[in-house]
UniProtKB/Swiss-Prot annotation:
<dbReference type="GO" id="GO:0003735">
    <property type="term" value="F:structural constituent of ribosome"/>
</dbReference>
<dbReference type="InterPro" id="IPR023591">
    <property type="entry name" value="Ribosomal_uS2_flav_dom_sf"/>
</dbReference>
<dbReference type="GO" id="GO:0015935">
    <property type="term" value="C:small ribosomal subunit"/>
</dbReference>
<keyword id="KW-0689">Ribosomal protein</keyword>
<comment type="similarity">
    <text>Belongs to the universal ribosomal protein uS2 family.</text>
</comment>
<dbReference type="InterPro" id="IPR005707">
    <property type="entry name" value="Ribosomal_uS2_euk/arc"/>
</dbReference>
<dbReference type="GO" id="GO:0006412">
    <property type="term" value="P:translation"/>
</dbReference>
<dbReference type="InterPro" id="IPR001865">
    <property type="entry name" value="Ribosomal_uS2"/>
</dbReference>
<keyword id="KW-0687">Ribonucleoprotein</keyword>
<dbReference type="InterPro" id="IPR023454">
    <property type="entry name" value="Ribosomal_uS2_arc"/>
</dbReference>
<protein>
    <recommendedName>
        <fullName>Small ribosomal subunit protein uS2</fullName>
    </recommendedName>
</protein>
<dbReference type="Pfam" id="PF00318">
    <property type="entry name" value="Ribosomal_S2"/>
</dbReference>
Amino acid sequence: MDTLVPINVYVKAGIHIGTRHLTKDMKPYVSKIREDGLAIFDIRKIDERLRLASKMLSYYEPNEILVVGRRETAITPIKKFSEITKVKAFPGRYPPGTLTNPQLKYYMEPEVILITDPIMDKNALHDAYESGITILALCDTNHTKNYIDFCIPANNRGSKSLALIYWILAREYLRNRGVIGKDEQLKVPVEEFETKITVEE
C-alpha cells in the first residue's frame, strides 16, 4: 500500500525524529537509536497510525471532535485543521474544566479528542479521561500511553512535523467523509499549516 505522502516528505518534515528518552510503550514504533542517542520512529508505522486515526475521526461529525495543543508549534496547525474541517479546537491553553464542568460557558461534550502532547496537554487528557471521551494523541518517544485510547507515534514538537501531521489528518478526514474526492488534494498547502517562529527551541 502506498504511504499517505511520499516517504521523503515525511523525512524532510522530521516526523520520525524522536527524543533521547524511549519509554516501553513507544518502543514498538521505533526502528533504531541513532549514535547521538535520538530514538527514530519507523515511518511506515507512523503512516499506518495516521491512516487509522483519520479513519477513526471520520466516523464523527466535526462538532463531535475537539483538538487541543498548547505547544507553540502546534497553534497554527490546529487553527488551520479546525478552519478546514470545521472541527472544534483549543489552539494554545486549554481551559481546565471545559469537558467536566457544565457550569462553564465554554463547556463542551465532544465524543472524541485529539491531543497534541499528552504531557503539555495533561489537563485536557485528564478531563477527557474523566468524561469518558475517546482519546487520540500524538505520542513522542518519551511518552506513555496512559489514558490514551489510540496513539499516533510522531515527532510532536517540530513545526514542520506538526504541520504535516495536521495537513494529512485534515485531507484524510475530508476524503473519508466524501467532502473532497479520494485523490483530491487540499487547496491549502502544507506550508500554511506551519507555525513560523523565529527561534526554534
